[in-house]
Structures are given as C-alpha cells and as structure tokens.
Amino acid sequence: MDAPASLRGQLLLAMPGIGDPRFEKAVIAMCAHDENGALGVGVDRVMPGITLHGLLEQLDVDPGIAPDCDILLGGPVEQRRGFVLHSTDWLGEDSLLVEDRWCLTSTLDVLRAIAEGKGPARWLVALGYAGWGEGQLDGEMRRHGWLATRAEDGLIFDHRPPRRWEAAMRSAGIDPRLLAATSGQA
C-alpha cells in the first residue's frame, strides 16, 4: 500500500459530518504530517478571555508595540502551550519551516521580536494544537471528515477567525450552504 500524501503546508477544513464538536467548521494549518502522525494549528476560533498583551504579561514579556490582538484556540491538545504561525521573513533558531509557505515557532524569541517590532510581517498566536497519532488523520480523511485544500496566506492571516472556514470553502470552489452533514444510501 502506498504511503499517504503529506498534508504538510495545506489547510484542513472540517466537513459538516466530522462528528466531533471540537472541530465543527475547523480550519487547521497543517505543519507536520508523516507516517508517525500529524500536527496542525487551528486558525478559526478565538480563545476566550485572553489577548496578546495579556499573554505577554503572563510570560513577563513587555508588550511593547505589539497590537493587542486575539489569541486563537490552536486545538484541543496542550492548550497551555503557545504557537506562533508566521511568515517566512523571520526565522528563529527553533522555527519549523513549513513547505516554504510559513513557519511555526513555539519559543519566546518570536513573541519578543513581535513586541519589539522586529518580528515577522504576518503572524498569529495560538494556544494548543491539533494532533493525530500514527494513521489517525489518514483514517479521518478516508471517512471524509476533512477536506484538504491549498493554504493561501490570505486565508490564514487576513480573514477574521470566524469567517475563515467559509472563506476557505469558497476558495476551494465549494458553496458551504450546499454541504450536508449526512449522505443518503442507494
């Protein structure tokens, strides 16, 4: 059997029948996917009760000139762990370059650089991530729980989080109003 194609650098869009309310209308930026599992960061939901300035203050980082923007809920795994998904114009020592499209950094140096106005041009901050064990995501893809689509930077960085799923579906040529959670049988 052939190994599944890597979804790294793509967006996963939750289909209506995904069956897990944590992922309803989810948009996941896929950062790693191989035979051992997969990791992505959700870019569609705002984390309630915390903004960037609040997070920086908790981490003893002066917010400096950083905008006080929303923090996103990156996924259900390790929600106390932070991730910055950002453009490739800034690379830290521990940044993960994802298909020459964007980077994922989970160290304080990127937050300090953002606060000082020396960070990446485009970025978002998320707490938590979406993770899948060996073969798990591949099974969900076979059951049509997710749609993989091209990850356009504008979808990730420019649209407001609640609108990203619909915008990504439309970008993939799908009218979300026409999707059904269940299908019939002949």
UniProtKB/Swiss-Prot annotation:
InterPro entries: AlgH-like. Coiled coil: none annotated. SUPFAM superfamilies: VC0467-like (SSF143456). One of its GO terms (cellular component) is cytosol. It holds the Pfam family DUF179. Belongs to the UPF0301 (AlgH) family. HAMAP family: UPF0301 (MF_00758). This is UPF0301 protein Swit_2673. It comes from Rhizorhabdus wittichii (strain DSM 6014 / CCUG 31198 / JCM 15750 / NBRC 105917 / EY 4224 / RW1) (Sphingomonas wittichii).
